[in-house]
């Protein structure tokens, strides 16, 4: 995939005829996460702590593994051979670790999708998980 592809490819292959781009979904997810976190801090004050830097970084990068999971062949977007056996939360964590990103960011990347349902999520990961699904699930309805 090339940078320009991200404004054109659908954000998910799980939604038939999805016309929402990868980058549009990404911007929406980040904005939702920030809005949720700010609202929670405004209403709950000291009762909740959100590391905004970690949360925003994680929200931006949750789908970085899709750059390995997806490929364009003959002008058509599909799942790469790699992506057929390694989903984007796993490859995304590997990319983040390779570049020395903090464990909190890696955690958000690894737990933002269904793979995170079996373990513990940090506050930041919970917020990003829900922001991601709010900007995903309605397109499956």
Outline where the language-model segments fall.
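Aromatic- and histidine-enriched alpha-helix N-cap/loop-to-helix transition segments
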Residues: 24-28, 87, 122
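Histidine/acidic-rich helix-loop-helix segments that form or flank divalent-metal centers
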Residues: 44-46, 50, 55-56, 93-97, ...
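Histidine-centered active-site/metal-ligand motif
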Residues: 25, 62, 88, 112-113
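Short, surface-exposed linear patches
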Residues: 39, 81-83, 130-133
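Acidic/His-rich, divalent-metal-binding segments that scaffold phosphate/diphosphate chemistry
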Residues: 1-78
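Divalent-cation-assisted or electrostatically stabilized phosphate/pyrophosphate-binding catalytic cores
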Residues: 76-98, 126
């Amino acid at each position: 995939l090339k940078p320009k592809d991200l404004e054109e490819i659908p954000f998910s292959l799980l939604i038939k005829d999805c016309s929402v781009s990868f980058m549009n979904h990404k911007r929406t997810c980040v904005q939702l996460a920030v809005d949720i976190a700010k609202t929670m801090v405004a209403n709950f004050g000291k009762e909740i702590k959100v590391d905004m830097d970690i949360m925003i970084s994680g929200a931006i990068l949750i789908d970085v593994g899709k750059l390995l999971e997806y490929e364009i062949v003959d002008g058509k977007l599909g799942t790469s051979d790699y992506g057929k056996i390694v989903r984007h939360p796993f490859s995304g964590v590997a990319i983040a670790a390779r570049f020395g990103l903090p464990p909190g960011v890696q955690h958000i990347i690894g737990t933002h999708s269904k793979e995170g349902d079996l373990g513990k999520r940090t506050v930041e990961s919970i917020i990003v998980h829900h922001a991601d699904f709010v900007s995903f699930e309605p397109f499956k309805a």
